Amino acid sequence: MNEETNNEFKKNLEKFKKMAKRGKETKMDKKPQIIVVGRSNVGKSTLVRLITKKDVRVGKKPGVTLKINKYDVGNFILVDLPGFGFMTGLEEKVQNKIKKEIVQYIEDNKDQIVGSIILIDVKAFPGIVERWDSKDEIPIDIEMFEFLEELELNPSIFINKMDKIKKNDQDKTLDKIVAIFGCPAPWRQWINDIITIGILKEGIGLNEVMVKINKNVNEYNRVKNKK
């Protein structure tokens, strides 16, 4: 990484850290938040663009999103967190700092976060898990899911890029994926509850995501209005 690129990454990282630390001070009107998390290049920015209908930078290279991006969608705030995993051009120690800041932001804002969406790539994910298993380590995707569950932040998993696997292999692959997240097969029993499948580049799966978001936001407002 050349000096100019390195300085730009450091600048973005400092902005990210400041936003994460300010957390509660930067909430828009104290509206409920929906966070979007996942590895780099799984379709996070595409999902954000579909929900917000705003021009969101979408890149083919991993690690396009390097800072927290918040979008006011009316009755809730959509928060696009940096992709974890491999990030183009970033040193490992910088990547680890960003991961810590993601966790810090979630912890600082847990009272406002009413739902969380973890995106995964249906074709790439099983191989990622196998590589981590070979090192006797838990993939960060699973750690994040368990972390969000522990905080009761209503995590759901969006399995993206369904067009990348053959139809004959879909049931077997999806059964394997839900089992990895601790949900017994068959995968269909979890559809539109914990699991949503789709092809975001074609907008497939967006309606199901919005149903979940609205359900979580409405429940938050119902409880809040009772107080």
Curated annotation (Swiss-Prot):
Disulfide bonds: none annotated. One of its GO terms (biological process) is cell division. Its cofactor is Mg(2+). GTP binds at residues 38-45, 63-67, 80-83, 160-163, 197-199. Keywords: Cell cycle, Cell division, GTP-binding, Magnesium, Metal-binding, Nucleotide-binding, Septation. Necessary for normal cell division and for the maintenance of normal septation. This is Probable GTP-binding protein EngB.
